């Protein structure tokens, strides 16, 4: 029989109609000779009533066989419920069953199919098809579909062209590790799965496409955390002849449209802009969460002359003030914060508490001479807790930035209903890699340096600034973009600054350098992490919750057992051998 509608769509206006529904048995209850079934489908739950006085013996026998997650087809008439259930959208009605067919049976599931069930992440991923039956999971994917629909319509209306770029590309040395794909035809050679369509979308600008977009899969072989996956989806944009501001205006309009159409929230435009240095110095992060204060304070000069070498000899001494919560943190709690601080390179964590106008704590005795200045500078009051880090400026900023976020979560200081967008601009072009012992691109090597700092490509690389911009939401980097290099000589200078020889640059990027000899227009763009955006819209804290079949923290899939061994025959065809090292 043809399904009349979704179970979750049945309402009062359908009373008196005979309909056919199909779905899963969510729950069965036997009460006073009647059998009650909660039928679940994609759109919700509907109560079925099976009365032995109204159905044949066969139907009743079938009903008695029903168990959770059986797939069934039912026919019956919609009636008003004697006692409405306000918790259900269908709670005013029920279906009086006249016909029932079991379409498939089900084993006892490894966990109950309902929201809020306690089950391990690996079990959820092992039985992902069951996990996805839960209503909150379905809602997340409806939200994701709505988000991509809004984005496509918005960009289509602005004249952007949706173009698919290759999945098998050339491996490049910058950035994260590539996922490599061996070529059977060109043996000994490898493709790479794209970390982004960066170069190909730039080449589309050279081709005259003017405005490109793509909702595209990307791949990075990197260590995983809550907001990262080895394969992820991004909203990729590129434009020709537009300024940094014009590109940001387009992106802001897109985000505003998504927020209005998916959440019913009007966001204020334009988004605030914050310089990279200000973000690091005041928030300790290049992706600051501006929903709460607790700013980093620089005390380096104030404590320079005190008799406490940890402070007086440090490159930087910075602090955060936890207002009015000193009594919430015992010595044991502060020890935990100290261990947390060490994860970010800090040697330790100094602290003091303010009680009735006096300082208490291990370092209080060293601060006697600057107590009044410190109180005034930090605007200290009774029951304040002050946490200090004395180290390099980078370590102090990073450590206190992480502590700031951790403490705000512990103390419920964050308004979770807020969506605070901002742009982080004025980025450094390069960042120093301790591991590589060289400067590397802060974004990528195709980013345009500012006209004022480009001369430092042959001088002090720390002084080179980029025409780059990141969009940030609630402490998460949603995406990043920049104006790109379109002149061959500038691109060659960039490669030299990164340590490429002319031969290496030509081997890796010769096709791009050649393209720059054929009228490459000024261009720029941006990419936004779709998974991360939907995660935040859905109020989740892990992008696995908005990816249908994600990997676990070991980059493996407990359901399919990927990655897996392959046969010797497959390896022979590729002329590959696996060496095992103890």
Curated annotation (Swiss-Prot):
It comes from the Bacteria. GO terms for biological process: aspartyl-tRNA aminoacylation. The keyword Transmembrane does not apply. InterPro entries: Aa-tRNA-synt_II, aa-tRNA-synth_II, aa-tRNA-synth_II/BPL/LPL, Asp-tRNA-ligase_1, Asp-tRNA-ligase_1_N, Asp/Asn-tRNA-synth_IIb, AspRS_core, GAD-like_sf. Keywords: Aminoacyl-tRNA synthetase, ATP-binding, Cytoplasm, Ligase, Nucleotide-binding, Protein biosynthesis. It is an enzyme of class 6 (ligase). GO terms for molecular function: aspartate-tRNA ligase activity; ATP binding; catalytic activity, acting on a protein; nucleic acid binding; transferase activity. It is found in: Cytoplasm. Residues 198-201 are annotated as: Aspartate. It catalyses: tRNA(Asp) + L-aspartate + ATP = L-aspartyl-tRNA(Asp) + AMP + diphosphate. Pfam families: GAD (PF02938), tRNA-synt_2 (PF00152), tRNA_anti-codon (PF01336). L-aspartate binds at residues 174, 220, 443, 484. Its EC number is 6.1.1.12. One of its GO terms (cellular component) is cytoplasm. Its main location: cytoplasm. ATP binds at residues 220-222, 229, 477, 529-532. The keyword Aminoacyl-tRNA synthetase applies. Homodimer. Catalyzes the attachment of L-aspartate to tRNA(Asp) in a two-step reaction: L-aspartate is first activated by ATP to form Asp-AMP and then transferred to the acceptor end of tRNA(Asp). HAMAP family: Asp_tRNA_synth_type1. Belongs to the class-II aminoacyl-tRNA synthetase family. Type 1 subfamily. This is Aspartate--tRNA ligase. It comes from Streptococcus equi subsp. zooepidemicus (strain H70).
């Amino acid at each position: 029989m043809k399904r009349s509608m979704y179970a979750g769509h049945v309402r009062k206006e359908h009373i008196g109609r005979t309909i056919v529904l199909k779905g899963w048995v969510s729950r069965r209850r036997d009460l006073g000779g009647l059998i009650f079934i909660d039928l679940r489908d994609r759109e919700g739950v509907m109560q079925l009533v099976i009365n032995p006085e109204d159905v044949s013996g066969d139907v009743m026998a079938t009903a008695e066989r029903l168990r959770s997650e059986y797939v069934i087809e039912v026919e019956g008439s919609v009636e008003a419920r004697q006692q409405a259930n306000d918790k259900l959208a269908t709670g005013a009605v029920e279906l009086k069953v006249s016909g029932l067919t079991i379409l498939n049976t089900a084993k006892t599931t490894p966990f109950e199919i309902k929201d809020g069930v306690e089950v391990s992440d690996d079990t959820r991923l092992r039985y992902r098809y069951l996990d996805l039956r839960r209503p909150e999971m379905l809602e997340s994917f409806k939200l994701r579909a709505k988000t991509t629909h809004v984005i496509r319509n918005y960009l289509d209306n602005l004249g952007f062209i949706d173009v698919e770029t290759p999945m098998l590309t050339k491996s490049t040395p910058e950035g994260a590790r590539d996922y490599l794909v061996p070529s059977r035809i060109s043996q000994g050679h490898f493709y790479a799965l794209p970390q982004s369509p960066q170069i190909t979308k730039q080449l589309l600008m050279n081709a005259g496409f003017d405005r490109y977009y793509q909702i595209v899969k990307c791949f990075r072989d990197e260590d995983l955390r809550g907001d990262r996956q080895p394969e992820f989806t991004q909203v990729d944009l590129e434009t020709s002849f537009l300024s940094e501001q014009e590109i940001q205006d387009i992106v802001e309009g897109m985000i505003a449209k998504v927020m209005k159409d998916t959440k019913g929230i009007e966001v204020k435009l334009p988004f605030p802009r914050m310089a990279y240095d200000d973000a690091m110095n005041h928030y300790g992060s290049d992706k600051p969460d501006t929903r709460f204060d607790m700013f980093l304070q620089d005390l380096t000069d104030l404590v320079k002359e005190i008799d406490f070498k940890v402070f007086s000899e440090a490159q930087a001494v910075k602090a955060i003030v936890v207002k009015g919560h000193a009594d919430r943190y015992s010595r044991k709690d502060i020890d935990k914060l100290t261990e947390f601080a060490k994860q970010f390179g800090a040697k330790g964590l100094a602290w003091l508490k303010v009680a009735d106008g006096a300082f208490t704590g291990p370092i209080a005795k060293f601060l006697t001479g600057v107590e009044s200045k410190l109180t005034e500078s930090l605007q200290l009051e009774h029951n304040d807790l002050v946490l200090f880090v004395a180290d390099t400026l980078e370590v102090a900023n990073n450590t206190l930035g992480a502590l700031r976020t951790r403490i705000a979560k512990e103390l419920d200081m964050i308004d979770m209903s807020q969506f605070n967008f901002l742009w982080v601009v004025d980025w450094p072009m390069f960042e120093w890699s301790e591991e590589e012992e060289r400067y590397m691109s802060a974004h990528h090597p195709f980013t345009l340096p500012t006209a004022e700092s480009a001369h430092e490509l042959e001088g002090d690389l720390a002084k080179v600034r980029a025409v780059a911009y990141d969009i940030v939401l609630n402490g998460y980097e949603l995406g990043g973009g920049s104006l790109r290099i379109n002149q061959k000589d500038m691109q060659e200078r960039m490669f030299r600054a990164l340590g490429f020889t002319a031969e290496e640059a030509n081997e890796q990027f010769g096709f791009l350098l050649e393209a720059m000899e054929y009228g490459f227009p000024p261009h720029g763009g941006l990419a936004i992490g779709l998974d991360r955006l939907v995660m935040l819209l859905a109020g989740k804290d892990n992008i696995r919750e908005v990816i249908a079949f994600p990997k676990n923290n070991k980059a493996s899939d407990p359901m399919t057992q990927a990655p897996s061994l392959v046969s010797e025959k497959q390896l022979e065809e590729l002329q590959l051998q696996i060496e095992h090292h103890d």
